[in-house]
Amino acid sequence: MKKEIASHLLEIGAVFLQPNDPFTWSSGMKSPIYCDNRLTLSYPKVRQAIAAGLEELIKEHFPTVEVIAGTATAGIAHAAWVSDRMDLPMCYVRSKAKGHGKGNQIEGKAEKGQKVVVVEDLISTGGSAITCVEALREAGCEVLGIVSIFTYELEAGKEKLEAANVASYSLSDYSALTEVAAEKGMIGQAETKKLQEWRKNPANEAWITA
């Protein structure tokens, strides 16, 4: 499953690997990878494979789920498809409460005591997913965990999720993606080394000259 999804993401350009010409993230950090899972919305076969995979993860790890919650905005569509497949209620969670109307942060019903699974598109440092989890917990929901399309497997993300006491499972990850990219001839040994070094310590730009 991990390599299949990784292959899909590479084929449609949802993930770019540029170890020799790094991207600059909004945080200012240099990165050899850029992920835009919103592109999956435009490819029916890919998004169907993702929805099926997320459903499988949820049934395996969180079988008692009662509500599917999407993170705004990238997780909303995938949460909708998954909730439809599972015939479950769905809601989505904003990064912060609206400044007008009812001032909702959670849109749709997520009632006190309900068991919720969060659908996220990407786990980087885990910040947006944890914000979603905290909002649901404040509303009295029991958050069973998070499922996502892809994770960078960063230690910072793992630590934040552990600190928030929330389980997280992804369809694919950085390790599988780099392996598939190498198998497809998209990167060579030198590029693979840079990618491996970046993941060990993203904040240390020494990987650029590795």
Curated annotation (Swiss-Prot):
PROSITE patterns: PUR_PYR_PR_TRANSFER. Orotate binds at residue 124. Its cofactor is Mg(2+). InterPro entries: OPRT, Or_phspho_trans_dom, PRibTrfase_dom, PRTase-like. One of its GO terms (molecular function) is magnesium ion binding. It is an enzyme of class 2 (transferase). It catalyses: orotidine 5'-phosphate + diphosphate = orotate + 5-phospho-alpha-D-ribose 1-diphosphate. Pathway: Pyrimidine metabolism; UMP biosynthesis via de novo pathway; UMP from orotate: step 1/2. Keywords: Glycosyltransferase, Magnesium, Pyrimidine biosynthesis, Transferase. Its EC number is 2.4.2.10. Gene3D superfamilies: 3.40.50.2020. One of its GO terms (biological process) is 'de novo' UMP biosynthetic process. 5-phospho-alpha-D-ribose 1-diphosphate binds at residues 94, 98, 100, 120-128. The keyword Lipoprotein does not apply. The keyword Ribonucleoprotein does not apply. Catalyzes the transfer of a ribosyl phosphate group from 5-phosphoribose 1-diphosphate to orotate, leading to the formation of orotidine monophosphate (OMP). Homodimer. PANTHER family: OROTATE PHOSPHORIBOSYLTRANSFERASE, URIDINE 5'-MONOPHOSPHATE SYNTHASE. Belongs to the purine/pyrimidine phosphoribosyltransferase family. PyrE subfamily. This is Orotate phosphoribosyltransferase. It comes from Bacillus thuringiensis subsp. konkukian (strain 97-27). The gene is pyrE.
